[in-house]
């Protein structure tokens, strides 16, 4: 190979070492994609991920995403794809200097904003946490808002201190221990108001059943 050819080959390799492009196809089963760069489309290339050993991550790039092509030795056939670069079609979803912000195609958002120390998850339909041992939340105040119902499906619920509730319905019986104080309303048992019902019979003897 003459000197001119060597220079041209070297220039080609240098041009190909780092290129930008747009993903045009993805093969999720193979973990590969094809990228349009300049006037050509690459072969199926692997994309880079955060971890790929004992701990592994998965976050597939999407069609239309702008990426870098990293070609070792300038050979595009064996290059790797590094997502992603903001573009006019896919601009930055946040302008915060410090926030971690993830926006998904369905509109769901996960964000942690250090300026307000606020973690926000919005736009999701369901959430599931499964633990084989326990789940602990330690916080001064917990607020749960449910428009329909909150279900505690467990053999036992323990409240270690005061319980305040607007209404209470017990369906399968139970026991109470300790002093009970009732004020501000009627307390009835089997249709009889306890503090107003009367008993027939002589006041000096055993009374009858409540009226």
Curated annotation (Swiss-Prot):
Induction: Expressed in the late phase of the viral replicative cycle. GO terms for molecular function: metal ion binding. Pfam families: Phage_base_V, Phage_spike. Its main location: virion. Fe cation binds at residues 197, 199. Binds 1 calcium ion per spike trimer. Its cofactor is Ca(2+); Fe cation; chloride. Residues 183-211 are annotated as: Disordered. Chloride binds at residue 50. Keywords: Host-virus interaction, Late protein, Metal-binding, Pore-mediated penetration of viral genome into host cell, Viral attachment to host cell, Viral attachment to host entry receptor, Viral baseplate protein, Viral penetration into host cytoplasm, Viral release from host cell, Viral tail assembly, Viral tail protein, Virion, Virus entry into host cell. Residues 202-211 have a biased composition (Gly residues). Ca(2+) binds at residues 202-203. GO terms for biological process: entry receptor-mediated virion attachment to host cell; symbiont genome entry into host cell via pore formation in plasma membrane; viral tail assembly. It is found in: Virion. GO terms for cellular component: virus tail, baseplate. NCBIfam families: phage_P2_V (TIGR01644). This is Spike protein. It comes from Escherichia phage P2 (Bacteriophage P2).
């Amino acid at each position: 190979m003459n000197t001119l050819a060597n220079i041209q080959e070297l220039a080609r390799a240098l041009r190909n070492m780092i290129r930008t492009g747009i993903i045009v196809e993805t093969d999720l089963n193979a973990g590969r994609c094809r990228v349009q760069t300049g006037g050509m489309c690459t072969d199926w290339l692997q994309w880079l991920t955060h971890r790929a050993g004992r701990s592994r991550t998965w976050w597939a790039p999407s069609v239309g995403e702008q990426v870098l092509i990293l070609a070792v030795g300038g050979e595009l056939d064996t290059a790797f794809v590094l997502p992603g670069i903001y573009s006019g079609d896919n601009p930055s979803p946040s302008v915060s200097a410090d926030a971690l912000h993830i926006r998904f195609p369905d509109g769901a958002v996960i964000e942690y904003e250090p300026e307000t120390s606020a973690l926000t998850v919005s736009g999701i339909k369901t959430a599931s946490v499964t633990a084989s041992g326990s789940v602990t939340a330690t916080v001064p105040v917990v607020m749960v808002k449910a428009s329909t119902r909150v279900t505690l499906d467990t053999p036992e619920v323990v409240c270690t201190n005061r319980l305040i509730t607007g209404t209470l319905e017990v369906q399968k019986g139970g026991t109470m221990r300790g002093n009970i104080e009732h004020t501000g309303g009627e307390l009835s048992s089997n249709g009889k108001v306890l503090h107003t019902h009367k008993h027939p019979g002589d006041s000096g003897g055993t009374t009858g059943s409540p009226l």
